[in-house]
Amino acid sequence: MNNKFKDFFGFGDNDSYEERDAYEEHYDEQEEMQNSNRPTNSRDSNVVSIKAGQAGSGPSKIVLYEPRVYSDAKEVAQNLLNQRAIIINFSRMDDASARRVVDFITGTVYALNGEIQRIGDKIFLATPPKFETDGKIT
């Protein structure tokens, strides 16, 4: 009778409580293992997709450039990375420097899967991948 009284008020045999605690510990360990295998979406991540800036809802833009020195090529390439088409006029640049800029922009266009076309004497059109050009200038 003494044991029934202890069991009724929870002071009796602790075997059932120990089994429940062991089950909960095992369950918690499994849950921690599953959570540790999930990829984290940290805001501190240093990896950024090139295509991250492509989802802009604003209108598409065409940027006009007349570079004078080779260092202007970096700004032109940055606009391509931002999904803007570019018309480049090399008439104010010597031929050797213009060739170097065209090579730099061609590499950028190739990396982005874009396109570059000569549309006039010393004038080029460079476009990111989602632009289409039709027609020819003669």
Curated annotation (Swiss-Prot):
Residues 33-48 have a biased composition (Polar residues). Cell division protein that is part of the divisome complex and is recruited early to the Z-ring. Probably stimulates Z-ring formation, perhaps through the cross-linking of FtsZ protofilaments. Its function overlaps with FtsA. Belongs to the SepF family. One of its GO terms (cellular component) is cytoplasm. Keywords: Cell cycle, Cell division, Cytoplasm, Septation. It is found in: Cytoplasm. GO terms for biological process: division septum assembly; FtsZ-dependent cytokinesis. The gene is sepF. The keyword Glycosyltransferase does not apply. It comes from the Bacteria. This is Cell division protein SepF. Its main location: cytoplasm. The keyword Metal-binding does not apply. Residues 1-59 are annotated as: Disordered. Homodimer. Interacts with FtsZ. It comes from Lactobacillus delbrueckii subsp. bulgaricus (strain ATCC 11842 / DSM 20081 / BCRC 10696 / JCM 1002 / NBRC 13953 / NCIMB 11778 / NCTC 12712 / WDCM 00102 / Lb 14). Gene3D superfamilies: SepF-like protein.
